[in-house]
């Protein structure tokens, strides 16, 4: 009986470990503020190194767009869109640049109700502000 309970606990733990999201967060940051609710997400930081992702779900009629506001004082940040474990580069934000634009997504994302936005730094980034809305 003890062995059966032990095996059951191991199976449940294995299932929990394997049930993680498709993308992994791995980062070091100071003064990191993130928010992700439904079709909107944001991230602000003083310093950031690594990778962070947001899961966005589209509500209502699809417009096939992603609204993006981004700024970075120093460093370089790659912004990807992810679906099904794959990712595609949307744009690269470099130190001193800022963006306020609406990106029309490729047709392959037309039927996707859920996407991931993945932010990956190239080295250390300083004073970043990123906001997204999936339409």
Would you name each region that the model predicts?
Residues 121-135:
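Edge beta-strands of jelly-roll/beta-sandwich modules across compartments, strongly enriched
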Residues 1-6:
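Positively charged n-region of N-terminal signal peptides that target proteins for export
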Residues 21-57:
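Transition segment at domain starts
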Residues 74-91, 133-134:
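Short, surface-exposed beta-strand/strand-loop-strand elements in extracellular ectodomains
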Residues 55, 100-107:
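Exposed aromatic-hydrophobic patches
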Residues 71-76, 123-125:
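Short proline/glycine-enriched turn/loop motifs at strand-loop junctions of beta-rich domains
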Residues 59-66, 110-112:
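Extended extracellular/luminal ectodomain segments enriched in beta-structured repeat modules
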Residues 15-19:
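C-terminal motif of bacterial Sec signal peptides marking the signal peptidase cleavage site
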């Amino acid at each position: 009986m003890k062995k059966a309970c032990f095996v059951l606990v191991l199976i449940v733990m294995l299932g929990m470990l394997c049930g993680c999201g498709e993308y992994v967060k791995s980062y070091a940051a100071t003064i990191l503020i993130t928010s992700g609710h439904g079709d909107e997400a944001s991230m602000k930081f003083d310093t950031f190194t690594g990778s962070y992702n947001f899961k966005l779900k589209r509500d209502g009629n699809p417009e096939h767009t992603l609204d993006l506001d981004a700024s970075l004082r120093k460093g370089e940040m790659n912004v990807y869109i992810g679906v099904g474990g794959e990712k595609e580069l949307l744009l690269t934000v470099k130190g001193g640049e800022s963006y306020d634009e609406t990106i029309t997504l490729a047709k392959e994302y037309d039927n996707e109700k859920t996407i991931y936005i993945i932010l990956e730094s190239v080295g250390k980034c300083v004073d970043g502000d990123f906001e997204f809305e999936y339409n």
